[in-house]
Amino acid sequence: MSIITDVYAREVLDSRGNPTLEVEVYTESGAFGRGMVPSGASTGEHEAVELRDGDKSRYLGLGTQKAVDNVNNIIAKAIIGYDVRDQQAIDRAMIALDGTPNKGKLGANAILGVSIAVARAAADYLEVPLYTYLGGFNTKVLPTPMMNIINGGSHSDAPIAFQEFMIMPVGAPTFKEGLRWGAEVFHALKKILKERGLVTAVGDEGGFAPKFEGTEDGVETILKAIEAAGYEAGENGIMIGFDCASSEFYDKERKVYDYTKFEGEGAAVRTSAEQVDYLEELVNKYPIITIEDGMDENDWDGWKVLTERLGKRVQLVGDDFFVTNTEYLARGIKENAANSILIKVNQIGTLTETFEAIEMAKEAGYTAVVSHRSGETEDSTIADIAVATNAGQIKTGSLSRTDRIAKYNQLLRIEDQLGEVAQYKGIKSFYNLKK
């Protein structure tokens, strides 16, 4: 009864109006699962391949019909007949079927859509929530959210090099309260921006994209919004985080961090050592708890220096640096580079490999942050993954745009379902820092 009988993919649109895949899986019993695949704007060069058609006459070359066909004509034939509950065997079969190290033949987007749909169909068959199916009955930790309330870099037209300015309600007693704190700061920030005559349009991830005078101006404005909303900045209230997305402004030939790419003429151009110094200055000046991709994805020496200098005080997250890949993570652990990994399911392409990366991180004392992509859908799978793995942190955008709110609302439902056993760790989510 739990045998897969049908697999079907179609092309749908993501939050940026670009095509992506939606996959449906059916079993003999009538159990059903659906998965939708996100897409990134700033992508690591080592990520699994997102297969696009390249036909400029259709969706500007971004169509996903090839990936859809790969699901319907190749993957479906290979996995029909499998027990839907055997996630690992199905994921491994798809990896073998593709046969490339980066899933470039079938496309990571094709494989991931099936992987998610299989998990959802299995949960439906067993009549349990997805987070319970994936993590077992002892899953009870709600993640502390990283809320991206100001967008810069590749996610907006704002003249700021850093891609994301985030707030984290680390002092909140519950997820529900933490979400409220974040929403109230978001609205306080909007009011402040309006009063300054700055634009309140939002970027890809729902954060504002105003023309600030620089990084410090962005942070100072967030601190004012926290105060205006009635909260305190710091460990008992709300802390700040950055996604520098440094690979987006790193000049490989000159080996410098060229802020002029986003901030224009007159902006800083920093060496690797100067980039570390600058980040340390910001940490000394502001209540910063997390920095993502502070160094370029290939600047291993820079990462090691940054970790040596700040690794006990601040969460240093590898996104483009690790691309949710256990091979790169293992090297980072060995060389003491970074102390946290960002988990993006479409960077690696299957749920099995995603869970392996989280497990490896935890065993090494690294934290794991489950994350969305800038091109999202209404699919809320990552909310369930965050709870299923007891990851403790989730990064899923701002407090606007339904593609972001869908994940927060799912977490509210899960907290409700868990009732009194639900836990929200807040500042304790950063278990590898000296707090």
UniProtKB/Swiss-Prot annotation:
Residues at the active site: E205 (proton donor), K344 (proton acceptor)
UniProt record, GO biological process: glycolytic process
Q: Does the keyword Magnesium apply?
A: yes
Q: Where in the cell is it found?
A: Cytoplasm; Secreted; Cell surface; Secreted, Cell wall
Q: What is the effect of changing K312A?
A: 62% enzmye activity, about 200% increased plasminogen binding, about 1.75-fold better tPA-dependent plasminogen activation
Q: Does the keyword Metal-binding apply?
A: yes
Q: What is the free-text note on the cofactor?
A: Binds a second Mg(2+) ion via substrate during catalysis.
Task: Tell me which InterPro entries the record gives.
Answer: Enolase, Enolase-like_C_sf, Enolase-like_N, Enolase_C, Enolase_CS, Enolase_N
> Could you say which residues bind Mg(2+) here?
D243, E292, D319
Necessary cofactors: Mg(2+)
Catalytic activity, EC: 4.2.1.11
Record's superkingdom?
Answer: Bacteria
An example of a Pfam family matching this protein is Enolase_N
Which residues are involved in binding (2R)-2-phosphoglycerate?
Answer: Q163, K344, R373, S374, K395
Q: Name one GO cellular component term.
A: cell surface
- SMART domains assigned: Enolase_C (SM01192), Enolase_N (SM01193)
Write out the similarity annotation: Belongs to the enolase family.
Functional description taken from the UniProt entry: Catalyzes the reversible conversion of 2-phosphoglycerate (2-PG) into phosphoenolpyruvate (PEP). It is essential for the degradation of carbohydrates via glycolysis.
Q: How does it assemble?
A: Homooctamer, a tetramer of homodimers.
Give the protein name, as stated in the record: Enolase
- The species is Streptococcus pyogenes serotype M6 (strain ATCC BAA-946 / MGAS10394)
Task: Give the source lineage, highest ranks first.
Answer: Bacteria, Bacillati, Bacillota, Bacilli, Lactobacillales
